[in-house]
Amino acid sequence: MQMGSRLQCSRSRCRARYLCAPASMTVPITKKTLTEEAKAALKRLAVQQNPRVPEASNERPEVQQTLINTESGSPLTAFAHLDAAVPNLESSFLDLRDPMTAPDGTTPTKPQVHRLTAGFALGALLFTAPMAALNSVLIPQTISRLSGTDRVTDLALLSVVGTLLTFLMNAWISVGSDHSYCPLGRRTPWIIAGTVLTATSVAILSACDFMPLVIVFWLFTLIGHAMVSMPLAAAFGERVPDKFRDRADAWRGVGQAFGQVLGIIAAVSLTWAADDSGWDGTTRFAMMVFALCLVVAGVATLLVLPFEGSSSYLPREGVKKGDYFSQYRPPKGAPKFFIAFAARMFAIAATSGIAIYQWYLAQDGLGDVSQVAMFGLSGAAAVMSVMAVAAFVGSLLAALLLGRIARAFKDSRIPAIAACLLFVVAVVLPLTPIDRAMAVALYALFAGFAYVVYDGVSQGLNLATLPDVRSVGRSLAAFSLANTFGSLIGAVVCAIAIAVTGEYLLIFAVAAGCMAIAGVLTLLLK
């Protein structure tokens, strides 16, 4: 026993002496003491870590579908929960991975899932409202004040340039945010910078009385908005687990749709003296208000969303020349893809042409609308409010019934073509002798319903035209060009019709023709 206790005390003294020894003496073996053969043996036994480079956001199907719905699709389509999911071979439902794990590798807790759903819905609402106000009301008012009789031509030119710039910026920002490595993550820095740029540009825009400056700062506004919308769409596809993506997508769509209505009503309410030169009740004041709203949108969205993890540790890969636009190449050996592409392009043209010139239509294209009243507003402001609310009600009703409508027909072309016919009937109503204000309200109601049905049931038809399920993300990126081309066609053709005839009502005839072409092309899909 005495010998054992002495041995134990000796070991304790040795351990204490080792712990108290200098750092240089605590490492008995260093690399210098190993032979080259020993180093090679250790290297063979060590586990070689080869971390995978994260998938590019412009190749993720969920990201592309989110962008399509955000830019020119119907946001309430996701609220219908149609069984037409975008195929994705990376989905956890196709293997034994936990569906609670997001594509970025994180596993959010239940409170974090609620924060993700609320954050993306709130971001969609708060960012959509100012942009809807600017696009539909404030920019047309500013151009009308500065251009006078040339306002339609100038607005068409600004719309064309803005659409092309947005396309280029989306391609650049998607690659730039994918290759951002910092403690704040890949998407958060872009959202912060985009919010600052957008709010600053709108604030400066409110003080511009020179048309070239208006064009410059409006384009800066679009750049800033692209810096927000593209990273938000990428974050939505990466951070929301597969199990909860449908619910989060539905609430994001509701937020975007409600933001469109709220933005238009707020804009016309704040500009009851739009043509005056002061600040009270003018376009200048409204722009300053929405510039502050953009700041609130950025701060609130980032605070509600769980903080994004650091991207500093991610494996880095250089940017290649083809990374920017290679995803826009259409799939080979898919003739039906081009038919579906053209159908969507003309459907977008039918809706975008009316949306661009809607303020001028309400102001000068419907005759005497001074008796129209809603929400304490009258005249053109009331007409804009009525159309916004009617379109929202029609879209919401269609979203609630879309599941039943889609399941009632084995051939998805039948409800899609029926929706095209209903849309054509809706846009013809303002051309009839009935009361113009009532006609545009009915148009907004029926057209909102028809477009949601068409957008929802045509998704399955469009996905069926894609030849390879392994490249759905790239195919959807190419398909998203239909939004760009459709917006260009709608802006240019409607501007030509107004300039030649001087009648704003002819934009409804253009819309009817475009949607009729979309219906015929949809009939060719199978």
Model-derived regions: residue spans:
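Intracellular juxtamembrane helix-capping segments at the cytosolic ends
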Residues: 139, 227-240, 453-467
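A late C-terminal transmembrane helix in Major Facilitator Superfamily
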Residues: 470-500
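Helix-to-loop junctions at the C-terminal end of transmembrane segments
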Residues: 170-184, 397-411
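Glycine-rich segments within core transmembrane alpha-helices of 12-TM secondary carriers
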Residues: 166, 249-268, 480-491
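C-terminal ends and interior cores of transmembrane alpha-helices
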Residues: 192-209, 421-435
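Multi-pass alpha-helical transporter architecture, strongest
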Residues: 206, 297-306, 509-526
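Helix-loop boundary and gating motifs at the non-cytosolic
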Residues: 35-163, 339-343, 347-372
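A membrane-interface helix-boundary motif in multi-pass transporters
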Residues: 186, 271-292, 496-515
